[in-house]
C-alpha cells in the first residue's frame, strides 16, 4: 500500500522539508506540472558563493530551486570539524527567502542513512590524490550523499562551485559512470575583495590569518601570469608567493589538466593549491593556459555572474 499523503507546497513561498519522501513527492508533482527542478546541495553556513549557485539555478527558464542543507557526517574524518562546523540555520533561511527559493531540504543523518553505511559509493583513483591524500575516505562520503540527494530530489540540473574543483570533477565522473540522468553545472568561484575564495570555514580565521589567507589567490594569479613561460614557471611563481607568507603551511601546489589528469604543455589546465593557517585548511584553484599571453584561461574566473548558455536552455 502506498502512502497517499501529499506534502503541502505553497508556490512562491519558502517550503522547508526534512523528510526525503516529502521532497521526492513534491519534486515529482512539480515536474508533472512542467517545472524544472534545480538542486543546490550545501552544508549550510551560507555566503555569497552559495547564493551565486542559487542565482545560476534560478536563471534556468521554468526552474524551481531546491537547496539542501545537510552537514554530511560521512565526509568528515575523525580529527575534522564535524562537531564544530558553522551552523547558521535561521540566517540561511532568511538568505534563501530573500532569493525567492521555494524549497529547502533539511534532513537529519538518521533520515539520510536509516540503514547506516550498508551501501556507499566508492570512487576511482582520483579520490586518493590531492584532497584525498590526507583524507582517504572523504570523497566516498561526498559522492554517497550527492548520489542520495540526486535520487531523492531527481533534479534536471545540480549546481556546484568550482572552488572545490576536485569534488566537481569526481561528481561528474560518478554521474557519467553510473548513468545518472542529471546535468552537473560548475559555477565559478566567488571571491572577497582581496581575492580570498569564499568558504564557510573562513570564519575560523583570526584577523591576522584572514589577511594572510589572501596569499592563496595571489599565488594562483602569479602562477597564471607566469604560465607564458611554461608549466614549471607557473608552479614556481605560485610556490614563491606561498613560501613568502608567514605561518602558511602548504599541503600541495599542483598543475593538472581540466579533468585533473597529467598536465601537458600548450594546453588548458587547472592550478590548485591547499594550505593551512593554524587549524584552518584553505583550498583554491584557477583555470590557466600554458603559453597563453595572459595565462588566464577564463576571464570570468572571479566574477559572481557567469553565463553558461548551454545548460540554461
Swiss-Prot record:
It catalyses: (R)-pantoate + beta-alanine + ATP = (R)-pantothenate + AMP + diphosphate + H(+). Pathway: Cofactor biosynthesis; (R)-pantothenate biosynthesis; (R)-pantothenate from (R)-pantoate and beta-alanine: step 1/1. Beta-alanine binds at residue 75. ATP binds at residues 43-50, 161-164, 190, 198-201. Pfam families: Pantoate_ligase. One of its GO terms (molecular function) is pantoate-beta-alanine ligase activity. GO terms for biological process: pantothenate biosynthetic process. InterPro entries: Pantoate_ligase, Pantoate_ligase_C, Rossmann-like_a/b/a_fold. The reaction proceeds by a bi uni uni bi ping pong mechanism. Homodimer. This is Pantothenate synthetase. It comes from Mycobacterium leprae (strain TN).
Amino acid at each position: 500500500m502506498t502512502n497517499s499523503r501529499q506534502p503541502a507546497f505553497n508556490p512562491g513561498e519558502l517550503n522547508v522539508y526534512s523528510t526525503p519522501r516529502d521532497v521526492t513527492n513534491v519534486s515529482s508533482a512539480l515536474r508533472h506540472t512542467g517545472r524544472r527542478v534545480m538542486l543546490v546541495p550545501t552544508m549550510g553556513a551560507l555566503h555569497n558563493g552559495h547564493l551565486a549557485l542559487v542565482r545560476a539555478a534560478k536563471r534556468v527558464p521554468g526552474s524551481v530551486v531546491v537547496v539542501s542543507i545537510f552537514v554530511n557526517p560521512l565526509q568528515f574524518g575523525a580529527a575534522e570539524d564535524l562537531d564544530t562546523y558553522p551552523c547558521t540555520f535561521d540566517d540561511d533561511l532568511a538568505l534563501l527567502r530573500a532569493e525567492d527559493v521555494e524549497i529547502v531540504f533539511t534532513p537529519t543523518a538518521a533520515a539520510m542513512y536509516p540503514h547506516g553505511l550498508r551501501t556507499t559509493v566508492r570512487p576511482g583513483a582520483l579520490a586518493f590524490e590531492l584532497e584525498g591524500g590526507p583524507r582517504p575516505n572523504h570523497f566516498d562520503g561526498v559522492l554517497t550523499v550527492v548520489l542520495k540527494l540526486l535520487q531523492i530530489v531527481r533534479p534536471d540540473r545540480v549546481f556546484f562551485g568550482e572552488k572545490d574543483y576536485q569534488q566537481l570533477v569526481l561528481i561528474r565522473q560518478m554521474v557519467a559512470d553510473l548513468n545518472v540522468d542529471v546535468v552537473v553545472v560548475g559555477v565559478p568561484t566567488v571571491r572577497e575583495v582581496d581575492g580570498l575564495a569564499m568558504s564557510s570555514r573562513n570564519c575560523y580565521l583570526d584577523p591576522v590569518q584572514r589577511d594572510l589567507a589572501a596569499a592563496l589567490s595571489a599565488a594562483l594569479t602569479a602562477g597564471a601570469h607566469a604560465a607564458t613561460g611554461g608549466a614549471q614557471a607557473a608552479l614556481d611563481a605560485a610556490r614563491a608567493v606561498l613560501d613568502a607568507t608567514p605561518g602558511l603551511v602548504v599541503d600541495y601546489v599542483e598543475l593538472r589538466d581540466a579533468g585533473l589528469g597529467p598536465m601537458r604543455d600548450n594546453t588548458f589546465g587547472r592550478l590548485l593549491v591547499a594550505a593551512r593557517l593554524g587549524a584552518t585548511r584553505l583550498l583554491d584553484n584557477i583555470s590557466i593556459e600554458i603559453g597563453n599571453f595572459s595565462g588566464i584561461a577564463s576571464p570570468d574566473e572571479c566574477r559572481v555572474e557567469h553565463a553558461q548558455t548551454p545548460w540554461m536552455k
